[in-house]
């Protein structure tokens, strides 16, 4: 009833003054059509319209549909000629999370990055809410990519390993600054901490796939630690 997906599915139209005609001022974001958009994204023709196929969705399809809807929700403000979605996203996430938290062991639509994950603890949720305002766009994009790759509901061990690798690459580009920061704040000899940081990813089959790599460890446990550490 609130038409939060009207812009996504139909675009924005307005009447041409002194005529009976209308013109499109903003194309729909689900191009070329919702049916084709969802079929292309999910490689499944039986997704849209939702009301028709909802009961046939598996978990991955359902969660992916929710994520796509979150990305495309919003309304057009004719007074300012601007597309707005902040309030709509907040409302959508709140309502969806009321449902997701009661599903199985509990899930959560992460509002900053827009992906579904298992319910995070308070410390992790605070990290996920970071908006990257004090980072260069390119670095924040890498950080957001790694975050979604690691924590999304369907992430496997290979994806988690790649996410850790991305974070290590970010630190690599700031290696000297990281050394100085650790030395100043934690009074740790900077070369020792540097060796620890990069020794992990370089020696535990994260960055390299050589015979001398340590690979016999509980990856589910240690990957979580590495992700938090980096």
Locations of the language-model features?
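Charged interaction/catalytic cores of defense and host-pathogen modules
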Residues: 1-99
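Short amphipathic alpha-helical segments and their helix-coil junctions
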Residues: 34-53, 138-155, 204-214
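Residue-level detector of well-ordered alpha-helical segments, enriched
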Residues: 57-65, 162-166, 197, 226
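Helix-loop junctions and short alpha-helical segments
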Residues: 67-142
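Long, positively charged binding patches that form subdomain-scale interaction surfaces
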Residues: 108-191
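Alpha-helical oligomerization segments
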Residues: 165, 176-230
């Amino acid at each position: 009833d609130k038409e939060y997906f009207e812009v996504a599915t139909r675009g924005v139209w307005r009447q041409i003054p002194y005529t009976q005609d209308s013109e499109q001022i903003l194309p729909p974001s689900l191009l070329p059509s919702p049916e084709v958009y969802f079929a292309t994204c999910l490689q499944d023709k039986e997704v849209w319209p939702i009301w028709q196929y909802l009961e046939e969705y598996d978990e991955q399809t359902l969660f992916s549909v929710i994520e796509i809807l979150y990305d495309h929700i919003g309304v057009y403000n004719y007074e300012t000629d601007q597309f707005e979605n902040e309030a709509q996203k907040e409302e959508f996430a709140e309502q969806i999370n009321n449902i997701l938290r009661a599903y199985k062991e509990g899930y959560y639509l992460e509002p900053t990055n827009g992906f579904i994950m298992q319910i995070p603890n308070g410390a992790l949720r605070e990290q996920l809410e970071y908006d990257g305002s004090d980072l260069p766009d390119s670095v924040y994009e890498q950080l957001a990519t790694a975050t979604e790759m690691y924590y999304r509901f369907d992430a496997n061990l290979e994806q988690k390993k790649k996410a850790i690798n991305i974070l290590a690459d970010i630190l690599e580009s700031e290696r000297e600054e990281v050394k100085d920061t650790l030395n100043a704040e934690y009074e740790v000899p900077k070369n020792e901490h540097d060796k620890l940081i990069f020794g992990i990813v370089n020696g535990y089959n994260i960055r390299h796939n050589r015979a001398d790599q340590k690979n016999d460890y509980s990856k589910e446990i240690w990957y979580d630690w590495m992700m938090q550490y980096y």
